[in-house]
Regions:
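Acidic, histidine-bearing metal-coordination/catalytic regions of metal-dependent phosphoesterases
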Residues: 1-50, 70-72
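Surface-exposed intrinsically disordered loops and tails
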Residues: 20-22, 163-167
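Active-site neighborhood of divalent metal-dependent phosphoester/pyrophosphate hydrolases
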Residues: 43-59, 68-165
């Protein structure tokens, strides 16, 4: 179980001199801690949801998942093109991360693999900061009990000189 707290840093003029503000409980109204689960070491049952081609439409994501019981799922897989490009951290939250947190991400694990659109945009190189994979890669093999899950990163589908990139 875990809770989320935040403490303001009011000033930090040097490494040995930090002035802190008050600490706040980010979710005081919740009244209970979040749960957290890892993948089981054994077992043959595996239920999961795959989401892709959301293209930053958080309202669509919310409607799509309206009747999903996430407590019944082992994980959710983001299977590419969750946004149309990657322009900033703020854009990722607006595009789908805030909606995902409200729906399931506080307690349901996410597996992430890039689509061709996640390789586009000025912030694309920072995407791994939000979805750290095995050894910094967006591909890999995961075990969920006796089930083996293979994530592939197929990258971009067009050369750099393609007309879509003004080439």
């Amino acid at each position: 179980r875990y809770r989320i707290f935040s403490q303001e840093v009011q000033s930090w003029p040097d490494v040995n001199n930090v002035t802190y503000g008050k600490t706040v409980d980010a979710d005081a109204a919740r009244r209970r801690a979040y749960g957290f689960r890892t993948f089981p070491a054994a077992g043959s049952a595996c239920s999961f949801l795959v989401l892709n081609d959301i293209h930053g439409k958080a309202d669509y994501l919310t409607r799509l998942c309206k009747h999903v019981d996430f407590s019944e799922l082992g994980f959710v897989a983001f299977n590419g093109d969750m946004s149309s490009s990657v322009e900033s951290g703020e854009q990722l939250f607006k595009a789908y991360l805030d909606a995902s947190a409200a729906l399931f991400a506080a307690e349901t694990p996410i597996l992430f693999t890039r689509g061709n659109h996640e390789t586009r945009g000025v912030f694309a190189d920072s995407l791994g900061d939000y979805f750290p994979g095995q050894d910094g890669r967006f591909y890999g093999i995961y075990r969920y009990g006796d089930v083996c899950i293979l994530l592939l990163d197929c990258g971009e589908d067009k050369p750099d000189d393609h007309a879509e990139y003004n080439g």
